[in-house]
From Swiss-Prot:
Enzyme Commission number(s): 3.2.2.9
Name of this chain's protein: 5'-methylthioadenosine/S-adenosylhomocysteine nucleosidase
Family to which the UniProt record says this protein belongs: Belongs to the PNP/UDP phosphorylase family. MtnN subfamily.
Function: Catalyzes the irreversible cleavage of the glycosidic bond in both 5'-methylthioadenosine (MTA) and S-adenosylhomocysteine (SAH/AdoHcy) to adenine and the corresponding thioribose, 5'-methylthioribose and S-ribosylhomocysteine, respectively. Also cleaves 5'-deoxyadenosine, a toxic by-product of radical S-adenosylmethionine (SAM) enzymes, into 5-deoxyribose and adenine.
Gene3D superfamilies linked: Nucleoside phosphorylase domain
Catalytic reaction annotation: S-adenosyl-L-homocysteine + H2O = S-(5-deoxy-D-ribos-5-yl)-L-homocysteine + adenine; S-methyl-5'-thioadenosine + H2O = 5-(methylsulfanyl)-D-ribose + adenine; 5'-deoxyadenosine + H2O = 5-deoxy-D-ribose + adenine
Protein source organism: Histophilus somni (strain 129Pt)
Length: 229
């Protein structure tokens, strides 16, 4: 099985990149792709850059060049669901854009034309993540992850997202774009993120402080998933 792994920032991929054996590195269009093996699994690890366009472009290159059987998105996220703490892990059941609005033409909030109302994560991968988390005693929350080209750093913006997407458990800036590309290419995907902040007025300071912890937690989960595939 070939596994594609996508992270936006260097800090979010560096642990996994350091574990790749027989490594080949490709730099293309601002993206970096590390190819090789982790735990006898053939992997391609993409550092896409931040935001929806960078994530979509990088994921498209990853799928075209490497042709993975599945895609895992890893990294950090802002926690929204009640009780989530820094370092906790979230897994997607579905993803939507919190900054997309074509409701004037009858689409659901967060839905784009020619796309489903939400991008559904692969149920088998979601279940696998849940089982691994349970075995490892990891606090895991599954549910809707919302993406947009904004770092949410105010209580007002967070309240708006929660009001319009009441099932949201976490927010970030790339997952739905990755999911959209995987949907178009018919590639199973799942999002595994660790919480770095809680999206309030202190989010930027929390993010800077706890990004390394979130990156370590999400990378650890990805490694455990690779062991279980």
């Amino acid at each position: 099985m070939k596994v594609g792994i996508v992270g936006a920032m260097a800090q979010e991929v560096e642990i996994l990149a350091s574990l790749i054996e027989n490594k080949n590195v490709v730099h293309i269009a601002g993206c970096t792709i590390y190819q090789g093996n982790i735990q006898d699994k053939e992997v391609a690890l993409l550092q896409s850059g931040i935001g929806k366009v960078a994530a979509a472009m990088g994921t498209t290159l990853l799928l075209q060049m490497f042709k993975p059987d599945i895609v895992i998105n890893t990294g950090s996220a802002g926690g929204v669901s009640s009780g989530l703490k820094v370092g906790d892990v979230v897994v997607s059941t579905q993803t939507v854009y919190h900054d997309a609005d074509v409701t004037a033409f009858g689409y659901a909030k967060g839905q784009l034309p020619a796309c489903p109302p939400a991008f559904i994560s692969d149920p088998k991968l979601t279940a696998l993540v849940a089982n691994v988390a349970k075995q490892q005693g990891i606090n895991l929350t599954s549910g809707l992850i919302c993406s947009g080209d904004s770092f949410i750093n105010s209580a007002e913006k967070l309240a708006w997202i929660k009001a319009n997407f009441p099932e949201v458990v976490a927010i970030e800036m790339e997952a739905t774009a990755i999911a959209q590309v995987c949907h178009k290419f018919n590639i199973p995907f799942v999002v595994i993120r660790a919480i770095s902040d809680v999206g309030d007025g202190e989010a930027s300071m929390s993010f800077e402080e706890f990004l390394p912890l979130a990156a370590k937690q999400s990378s650890s989960m990805v490694l455990k998933i690779l062991q279980s595939l």
